[in-house]
Amino acid sequence: MGRSPASSCLRLISCSGGDDTSADPNSTALENKSSGDKRGWSFRKKSGKQRGLITSVVSETTPASRTRETLESALLKSPSPDNNNVSEKQQQSFSVDEKKSQLPVVTYVAEPVDEKKTQSVIEEKTELLSVEEQIDHRTEVSPVIVESKGTETEEDDLIGTELQGPSAADAAKIEEDVTSEVEMASKVEPEESESDDVIIVRKESDEKVDEKLDESVIVVIQAAVRGFLARRELLRSKKVIKLQAAVRGHLVRSQAMGSLRCVQAIVKMQAMVRARHSTKDGSRVSATSDKSEPNAAAQKLLENKFAKHLMESTPKTKPINIKCDPTKPSSAWNWLERWMSVPKPEKTSKANLTTEEQNLEETQNVKISPQADFVNSDSTVENKTETDMPSYEASKVEGQNVELSETEKMSQYDSPEASAEVYYDSIQSQPLAAKPDSLLEEPEYVDGQIKHSLKRKVSNPSFIAAQSKFEELTSSTGSNKAMTLSSKDDVLGEEGKTDIDSPDTTNTIKDHSLEDVTPAELSGSECGTELSVTSSLDTLEKKSDAEGAEPRVEAKLLEDDTFKTDQAELIEIDVKDATSMGTVEDPKEKVENAKDEVEISATHHEPVISTPDSKKRRAEDESGPQAYALSEGALTPMTITESQATPASQASSSVKARKGKSEKSGSSQKRKVSKKITSSPKQEIGTGEATEQEEGKEQKSGRRTSFGYDQEARESSGGKNSLPRFMQPTQSAKAKVQEHNSPRSSPDLQERDVVSAKKRHSLPGVTNGKQVSPRIQRSASQAQQGTKDRKWQR
């Protein structure tokens, strides 16, 4: 049998070193055919990646079934005789070793071969004996490299297997090792590279190392590392914070030093500017007084320890960057200009203050110095009159004048606005007389605050009308009173004893009004106008006290007709007193009260006529334009106080003008004076049997009734009670007043009034149950009837 070229593939198996493979080129063609035969019956897709051999380890990414196919294909390279042609040769080969015959049986079952391909292979393989010999003599199978070319998209695969074992047992061991390795590789994804296989091996080694280490040791190591990192970060943050604090402290200190230097420079410049102004104006005293304050402040600032430390630590010659350009708006320039502004000393204001202080001292001296003359004149005049003022009244007037300066200061400094209002009301309610300049300059004492309050008051139109009316009345009153006083001095002929001037009376009246009004204002009332009404009523009553000393030089015997006219005047006055508070609160009664007030205000201009027709003429004359003017004024409290102030003074002055020559012995006068001083107010209220005492008590009770109904009118008007409840008149006093009341046209009452009036020579006009004239008693009865009717109407 000749050898065919196909036997070259068998030579590859026979060579152990693999040197013949490179020499024989036909072996590659046979292997390509066998791989093509394999592709024909293989149903699995080959991977496109190359596989290489690793020493002692077979690394494959294909599953176990694919590795078995490659193994079986490698085993097919061994001679597989056909059933028909090579039966004898197979029997000979299997007889040599039965164990080796198992391998081809396994391959036949696993891999069936097509008939056409097997026939071509059988034809090429002619020499089978040589194969048997090689199987007998060779213990190792050389590695067969199968090169299989896939499709166009697949890459060439290089599969290398190393099979050891001359027997079937060795082949079985090799197969088991390959399957175990394939199972380990199957755990990895099929598309991993050779590096992944190395990583798997390393992981196994790490697991072995971890099993050996203890967990406590690992925790200690981790804690140490973390602590070191935290400490390093903390030190880094501390260093940053220290650096920031140092920079900020430097900046703050420099800024504080700059501000301190600025303040010090400003203080020095202010001192220089003030010194220059003082030398320029000539007023060194004011400059030094102003200069002491900033120096004290600068010293206090520089004595601070922190300021000293800053001043010492920084250089003194540090420039201050300030742009002194007044044309351009700059915050630094404005700040410096504001601190450097120095007010000029006002010479005019200081001069005015000095003159006003001198006027104050003069007026206080005037108010206090004539007091002795006033008391002396009272004592001399009492020798010629039957009735007199009680002794405690004189002491009261004296005490009020002495305490004037203190009350004036308290009213000016404690409540400037309230004092301004009260002072203005008290001045306006007085009858103006001989020294108008000194009286009119006084409201300007409280640093201009009174001027503001007066401006606010003048803005009221009703107040303007009332003020204009009051000025006309006071001007005429002053002239009439001056005339009556001059005539009185001529009649009396005693210049030293009866030296009672109008300024003295105005000053005393001003004292009473100030002393009574300021407590009312300081008591915390809500309405200033209401307080002005009450204070003006009190001032009216106290005016009658002060003026009661003047008409004591009256004549004892007067004619009946003159008494009637005087009685009519005083009735009108007291009717206004009783109804004045009603006009403030009740708007329905304004018309009636307006008529009464017109009658009162008109009495200043009318001459005193001793005929009973004078009342009718006055009523007709006054019902004209004056009533309209007062009704237009809306009857403010100021008009009430103004209209109340003048009638009492006018009545007293008119009585003084009509005085006859008084002819009465001093002894009889002193006896009656002593009797009336010892009499108590309770005895004055009670009724007596003697006609003279009864008439005198009627006069006193009449005055008490007018005062009581004045208070009752205040209560009914809904305003605040100026007197407490225990000082108001009792029911018994009111009942006694009602017994004496009768119609105005009653002839009995007129006769009784004439008899009592013959013995009356003065108008004391004292409140709180003191002696009064019967004229006021009749006015009180009319006021009582009017108030009763109004109550029933309500």
Curated annotation (Swiss-Prot):
Keywords: Calmodulin-binding, Cytoplasm, Cytoskeleton, Nucleus, Phosphoprotein, Repeat
Annotated SMART domains: IQ
Biased segments, Low complexity type: 643-654
Gene Ontology cellular-component terms listed: chloroplast envelope; microtubule associated complex; nucleus; plasma membrane
Biased composition (Basic and acidic residues): 487-500, 539-555, 585-607
Entry keyword annotation includes Flavoprotein: no
Entry protein name: Protein IQ-DOMAIN 32
Species in which this protein is naturally found: Arabidopsis thaliana (Mouse-ear cress)
UniProt lineage: Eukaryota, Viridiplantae, Streptophyta, Embryophyta, Tracheophyta
